[in-house]
Amino acid sequence: MQQTNLLIGTSAGVYELTGDGPRQDPALGSREVTALAAADGVAWAIADRRSIVRRGSDGTWTDVARSDEFDLVCLLPMPDGLLVGTDEAHLLRLDDHTLGRVAPFDAVEGRDAWYTPWGGPPAVRSIARDLGGRIHANVHVGGIPRSLDGGARWEPTIDIDADVHQVVAHPSEPDVVLAAGAVGLAVSENGGASWRIEQQGLHATYARAVAVAGDTILLSVSNGPRGGRAALYRTTHDLQLEKCTDELPEWFDGNID
C-alpha cells in the first residue's frame, strides 16, 4: 500500500496525498469530514458532524460511534482513549464505541460566562495535550480550561476575552503551549499556568490558526471575523514574527483556518 503523507478532510470525503499525488479515498464516499487526527498509526475523523470514524493501518475506515445530542467539532487521541470537543462546549470521551460526557469539564469555574459574539452557544474548537500530559481545551469564547490529571479536574486559564480560536501543544518543548486568538499569538511556557501575548510585527492582531513546523511557529492573521487582509506569519530565528511572502499573494480575502 502506498504510504499516505497527508489526509485532507473536505465537504465531499477525504483525500489522501501520497508520493503519487492526491486521490479521493472511496471508503468515506462523499461524507463531509470536518476534523482529522492521528496517533500510533490510526487516523480518526468526524464525518457528517455526528459520527466518529477510524482508519486502521490497512487503510480501512470504520464507523465507531455516533453522537445523537451534539455536533462534534474536534478530536484528540489520548493514551487511554479519544477526547471529542462539541458544540455547546462539552467534552466527550470514547469508551467501547460509546461517547460519554466528561462531567468535570461541565463544572469548570467560569463556565457561566462563556459566550459567542453572535449570541449562540460556545463550542470546544480544539484540544491539545502537551508533552507534560496536561490537556488544554480551547473554548470559543471561553478561554482555555486545562486539566493536570487526564480530565478528572479542570481549571480556567487565559482571559476569556482573548477570544481563542485554536490551541496547540509544542511537539518538542514540554511546557510550551500556543494559541491563536483575537489578541494575537498567546504563548505559555509553563504548561498553561500563565500566558503572554505576542503582537510585534503583525499588521493586525486577529489570529485564527497556529501550527508548529520544526523550529518555526506559523500564525494566520486577518482584520477580523469576516477576514480581509489575511496573511500568514512565521517566527524568525530570534522568535520575531514576520510575514510570509514567497509564492503567496500579498493578502488573502478570507480567514486562514
Q: Each predicted region: which residue ranges?
A:
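Extracellular glycan-interacting surfaces
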Residues: 1-257
